[in-house]
């Protein structure tokens, strides 16, 4: 059985992944799967820079607006749903194209990534929920140093899950993680977009300004009024920074500057992650040859035996 070819476009936020994916889909008869952990949520449009129907240009997209913010969409769920979408697109005789910046989610599709599908212990989880995030992370560091290096202490939900898996199975959560072996089902080409740091940061700042012009405050206020401030979906950059403003604990300008700052830091982490974790063919973004270079690489990849 021949492997399914998949084009994967990755890179930091605001680098130009979306426009490139549309161009390649049009030229290569492809359909697009969003590889963004936030764009799966309905109602989170402006803050996630979600592609609009007009921007889609008639290209079918998958894993956009598939669940409500109150319902968590995990990496394991993304893995299974993306694999289904790849099969659907391939069976239709089209090219699957994944585009996004959530490295863990994308990596899980192509590598033998085991998420530790242990059952839940609600009582144990409830006990952990009462603890401070710093204490939880210290517990994880003592019990599973490798997982502690991979999971930020602010990611309380994932820290708790790691502790819960160890509690249920007696096995460190890190032992369930990625094995650096490609899944035999797929033949992926990883294309990464890179941009000069100053230009990228300028783009990020401009994007945040545009989000405010498009109505980010209204979008975030709706989530705030629905009491969704603590769900994983709205912990993403662009929403949580505005909640103190709604509570009159910060100014609007402070909130905007914090979103820009957090977005820049996030872009830096994305680049570091992709460079250290995946075998990527990098392309310079923001130049006249970006699209043609990506198309040439994709065409060569698809025609190679």
From Swiss-Prot:
Molecular-function annotations in GO: ATP binding; tRNA dimethylallyltransferase activity
Region (Interaction with substrate tRNA): 36-39
EC number(s) given by UniProt: 2.5.1.75
Keywords in alphabetical order: ATP-binding, Magnesium, Nucleotide-binding, Transferase, tRNA processing
Record-listed substrate binding positions: 13-18
Needed cofactors: Mg(2+)
Catalytic reaction equation(s): adenosine(37) in tRNA + dimethylallyl diphosphate = N(6)-dimethylallyladenosine(37) in tRNA + diphosphate
Quaternary structure annotation from Swiss-Prot or TrEMBL: Monomer.
Protein name as it appears in the record: tRNA dimethylallyltransferase
Native source organism of the sequence: Listeria monocytogenes serotype 4a (strain HCC23)
């Amino acid at each position: 059985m021949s492997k399914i070819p998949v084009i994967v476009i990755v890179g930091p936020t605001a680098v130009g992944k979306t426009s490139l994916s549309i161009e390649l889909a049009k030229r290569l008869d492809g359909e697009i799967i969003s590889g963004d952990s936030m764009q799966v949520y309905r109602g989170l449009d402006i803050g996630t820079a979600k592609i609009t129907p007009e921007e889609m240009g008639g290209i079918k997209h998958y894993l956009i607006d598939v669940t409500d913010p109150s319902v968590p969409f995990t990496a394991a769920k993304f893995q299974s749903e993306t694999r289904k979408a790849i099969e659907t697109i391939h069976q239709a005789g089209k090219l699957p194209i994944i585009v996004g910046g959530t490295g863990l989610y994308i990596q899980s599709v192509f590598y033998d990534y085991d998420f530790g599908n242990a059952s839940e212990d609600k009582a144990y989880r409830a006990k952990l929920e009462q603890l401070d995030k710093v204490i939880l992370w210290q517990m994880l560091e003592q019990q599973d140093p490798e997982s502690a290096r991979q999971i930020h202490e602010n990611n309380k939900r994932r820290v708790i899950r790691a502790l819960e898996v160890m509690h249920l199975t007696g096995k460190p959560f890190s032992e369930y993680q990625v094995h650096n072996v490609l899944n035999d089902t797929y033949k992926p080409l990883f294309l990464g977009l890179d941009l000069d740091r100053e230009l990228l940061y300028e783009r990020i700042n401009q994007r945040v300004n545009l989000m405010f012009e498009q109505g980010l405050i209204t979008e975030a206020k709706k989530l705030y009024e629905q009491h969704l401030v603590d769900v994983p979906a709205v912990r993403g950059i662009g929403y949580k920074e505005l909640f103190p403003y709604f509570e009159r604990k910060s100014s609007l300008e402070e909130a905007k500057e914090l979103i820009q700052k957090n977005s820049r830091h996030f872009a830096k982490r994305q680049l570091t992650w992709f460079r250290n974790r995946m075998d990527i063919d990098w392309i310079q973004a923001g130049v006249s040859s970006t699209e043609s270079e990506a198309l040439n690489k994709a065409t060569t990849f698809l025609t190679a035996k």
